[in-house]
Curated annotation (Swiss-Prot):
Pathway: Amino-acid biosynthesis; L-threonine biosynthesis; L-threonine from L-aspartate: step 4/5. This is Homoserine kinase. It catalyses: L-homoserine + ATP = O-phospho-L-homoserine + ADP + H(+). It comes from the Bacteria. Transmembrane segments: none annotated. It holds the Pfam family GHMP_kinases_C. Catalyzes the ATP-dependent phosphorylation of L-homoserine to L-homoserine phosphate. Keywords: Amino-acid biosynthesis, ATP-binding, Cytoplasm, Kinase, Nucleotide-binding, Threonine biosynthesis, Transferase. NCBIfam families: PRK01212.1-4 (NF002288), thrB (TIGR00191). Gene3D superfamilies: 3.30.230.10, GHMP kinase, C-terminal domain. GO terms for cellular component: cytoplasm. InterPro entries: GHMP_kinase_C_dom, GHMP_kinase_C_sf, GHMP_kinase_N_dom, GHMP_knse_ATP-bd_CS, Homoserine_kinase, Ribosomal_Su5_D2-typ_SF, Ribsml_uS5_D2-typ_fold_subgr. It is an enzyme of class 2 (transferase). The lineage of its organism: Bacteria, Pseudomonadati, Pseudomonadota, Gammaproteobacteria, Enterobacterales.
Amino acid sequence: MVKVYAPASSANMSVGFDVLGAAVAPVDGALLGDVVTVEAAETFSLNNLGRFADKLPSEPRENIVYQCWERFCQELGKQIPVAMTLEKNMPIGSGLGSSACSVVAALMAMNEHCGKPLNDTRLLALMGELEGRISGSIHYDNVAPCFLGGMQLMIEENDIISQQVPGFDEWLWVLAYPGIKVSTAEARAILPAQYRRQDCIAHGRHLAGFIHACYSRQPELAAKLMKDVIAEPYRERLLPGFRQARQAVAEIGAVASGISGSGPTLFALCDKPDTAQRVADWLGKNYLQNQEGFVHICRLDTAGARVLEN
């Protein structure tokens, strides 16, 4: 039996639309991510467990884990009879890389079960392909950090899909999921087809400056440059209370904040534990909309997807 855990991730990080993402892990040790188990069997089967299993498609062939198994078998050119279990701990349409968690855990578990026939680059390419079936287009800003860990910059040149960017140990990521769903495809459809020149220039300056600040170890500058002129001005209308929440967390002391992925999760970066706790408390009382919502104080998950049992 192989059991693989794949962590949640926060894509875009305001400054890097479709090209930046960070894997996250709650500081209290909770597993914020999906788990997939693979066991040898006579025929294929898929069982869904976990807090959000009831939100998955009732038709097994529509389940992305089934599609991962099917695509992996196609890649190897043979049928692989296994019993798979998906422990769906991540809410769907949350902006925390929920589909990426399932895809990464499923493909990594299949690869481990079969003795690692695929290298990490090929595996990551498959992960992007499968996740793209749900989001509507191939982009690696969730699957890359989820699989490899840390903060990842998408390269997609010279057979390099992504590379790690150094993060800051003092940064605490407060993630608040309000409990409502935002479809990635819907959130992409709301964006303009073309952008003004000044917005393109500002976006390039912010992203280049952020990467420079990470490598030159300037956390204050990096946080200041986490601005979004590409998606947030258009997507915030999909997120009730988002603008007020951003203003409130800034007043409490967050050094940056924005939309995690395509939302509705809000991220707030803090550089002190007491500030992070105050921000988390405020968001828990004011940004959450129902019982399914949650707030976690996280750090970067530098390990990425990992085998829990083998």
